[in-house]
């Protein structure tokens, strides 16, 4: 996800208002679900785990494509203790167990609106609030939430093993509280996503991502962005979490498919001053 501002990155919408982007990030908003009870630690987290060994790596962009405004620079050494991480993102089926057990309502449900990519909107005209500022391919849709990812005319039918979407940082933390889990730090996430490889472009190495060698390795855009997606990899929206091949640590689709939350706040200058050993993330910044 991107920080709010005049120059959004990663093709994501800035949070200009509740009306346009209920589930995106800016300066961390106050949670709207203070009354929700998640019965901390009571949930069944039924996602397989990957053991990630302790080690050191160079964190940040090493290809020259990174953006300082996105907090991808400078390249710096990080050393981590061993930890475990989910092999996949949380699925719709797993998030439904949480919501059904607790009665939890996500922030998108409480706001009554969220941002939907324009090719994926399934909603009556009256529900369309309009494009988000700076990224008009994201449309504010009233009634869009995790149960209705494209809007009120959509559902989770056939999507139980797809990753849950329209989930804010606060929602992710509430799920973790119920499941007796935690979000990974950004350092843990990047280390795990690399799958034990160093000085390569992707979690699988330097082979192309786009199927030019006959093999698709992730769910990414194909075609002319943002107008036409050829869906050459098999998916125009999200893909089931066990699609493609896992990396060296056993993580499925650590790139592509969906954005994923980390525990850290966002501060574009943090890399320049973060500690080498188990960096916890900045004390201040947006989420």
Located regions from the model:
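Long, low-complexity intrinsically disordered regions
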Residues: 22-25, 31, 36
